[in-house]
A protein has these predicted regions:
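A "functional boundary" signal
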Residues: 27-184
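Hydrophobic h-region of N-terminal signal peptides that target proteins for export
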Residues: 19-29
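Sec-dependent signal peptide recognition
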Residues: 10-19
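Intrinsic-disorder-associated, low-complexity terminal segments enriched in Asp/Asn/His/Tyr and depleted
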Residues: 3-4
Length: 184
């Protein structure tokens, strides 16, 4: 009888702990969704995508996220969905063509929907950093100069900020510290 009561107590405690953790995680996700001003369903699914970021399944999950965001007329989450596909290829670092393709896909969508944050992030923090990490500093510099020219022509502060940051990184990698300092 005593053993039976202890196992019931342990089972009750386990249920309580599970429910507590479930509701705590749910409340946290809802708060984050509210903080980022995004639909809680989209945000929850985005988090699931992030959990699978290094697995090929994230590509189809990102397509689903894109469609869900499209149904809710959420252009920002559509950009995030395409960016997630780019992130998968960037972190795999095995297919340069895919990195270029998805960088351009993010840029095209971001340009069409006036979201420079995603436009310049994809270009600088994915494509140019990919080149930099693979020792291709001249191509990285070429892309950064193209990006700088465009950001200057459009007087885009987000783009200029990303350009200065990436130029500094490129010159640091090239061990041209005086040039790197100029871009900081």
């Amino acid at each position: 009888r005593k053993h039976h009561t202890m196992s019931q107590t342990a089972l009750s405690f386990t249920r309580f702990l599970f429910l507590f953790l479930f509701f705590t995680a749910s409340v946290k996700a809802q708060k984050e969704a509210k903080d980022f001003n995004v639909d809680s369903t989209l945000y929850a699914y985005y988090q699931r995508c992030q959990e699978c970021l290094l697995q090929p399944v994230v590509l189809s999950m990102s397509d689903t996220l894109y469609r869900m965001a499209e149904e809710r007329h959420d252009k920002r989450m559509q950009a995030v969905a395409i960016s997630t596909q780019l992130d998968y290829h960037y972190f795999q670092a095995t297919n340069e063509d895919s990195i270029i393709y998805y960088t351009n896909k993010v840029k095209d969508f971001a340009k069409a929907t006036q979201q420079p944050k995603y436009y310049y992030f994809a270009w600088s923090n994915r494509l140019i950093l990919y080149y930099l990490k693979n020792g291709r500093t001249n191509i990285a510099l070429y892309e950064a100069q193209k990006m700088l020219k465009e950001a200057q022509e459009e007087d885009d502060k987000t783009g200029l900020s990303r350009c200065y940051n990436i130029m500094s990184q490129i010159y640091t990698v090239k061990r041209l510290d005086s040039m790197a300092f100029e871009w900081q």
